[in-house]
């Protein structure tokens, strides 16, 4: 279980000198899909990860050191809150710079063990999400895993949840509002970063 967390630093772009002694979990998704809210819910801190009211305004890679406990043993991992993607209100040139920075970061950051791809449960087949999943698969290493996490599931009825889970069998459905699915997600994060989820 997660028992504590603190903010470490923010980066504008990939810095190969910022090494990590811990396994890392990267949170990716469209703007306003709920990345920061999910990190706050998992870490049980309301304002740990800050979300911007203006999509695309904050384009930083944010690092958080997370303390976990398993069988009385404590260990640390890093959560990485990546910039959201898919905004309409920024220039093409700025998008290209962001994409280049993220591409370099995701491919070269070998300490990342789990990519959590957040998808709005009401919009499950958007082209931008399909493209992200295909992109991650192209450079995924044997010690890495992609996990689809469908957010805002409190807005679905039971039938819609069952249909979604049936279509995406290895996914997790969560709601930051009523804390649905967070315990299951926490278990996967801990097992994957410890190398137990084979």
From Swiss-Prot:
InterPro entries: G_ENGB_dom, GTP-bd, GTP-bd_ribosome_bio_YsxC, P-loop_NTPase, Small_GTP-bd. Pfam families: MMR_HSR1. Residues 21-195 form the EngB-type G domain. The lineage of its organism: Bacteria, Pseudomonadati, Campylobacterota, Epsilonproteobacteria, Campylobacterales. GO terms for biological process: division septum assembly. One of its GO terms (molecular function) is GTP binding. Necessary for normal cell division and for the maintenance of normal septation. This is Probable GTP-binding protein EngB. GTP binds at residues 29-36, 56-60, 81-84, 151-154, 174-176.
């Amino acid at each position: 279980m997660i028992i504590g967390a603190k903010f470490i630093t923010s980066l504008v772009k990939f810095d190969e000198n910022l090494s990590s002694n811990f396994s890392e979990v990267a949170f990716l998704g469209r703007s306003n899909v709920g990345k920061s809210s999910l990190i706050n819910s998992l870490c049980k801190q309301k304002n740990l990860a800050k979300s911007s009211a203006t999509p695309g305004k904050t384009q930083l890679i944010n690092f958080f050191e997370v303390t976990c406990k398993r069988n009385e043993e404590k260990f640390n991992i890093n959560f990485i809150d990546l910039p959201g993607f898919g905004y309409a209100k920024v220039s093409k040139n700025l998008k290209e710079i962001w994409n280049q920075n993220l591409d370099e970061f995701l491919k070269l950051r070998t300490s990342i063990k789990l990519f959590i791809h957040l998808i709005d449960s009401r919009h499950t087949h958007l082209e931008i999400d399909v493209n992200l999943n295909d992109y991650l698969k192209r450079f995924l290493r044997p010690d890495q895993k992609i996990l689809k996490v469908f957010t805002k599931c409190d807005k679905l009825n039971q039938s819609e949840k069952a249909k979604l889970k049936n279509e995406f069998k290895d996914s997790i459905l969560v709601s930051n509002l009523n804390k649905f699915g967070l315990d299951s997600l926490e278990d996967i994060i801990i097992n994957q970063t410890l190398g137990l989820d084979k």
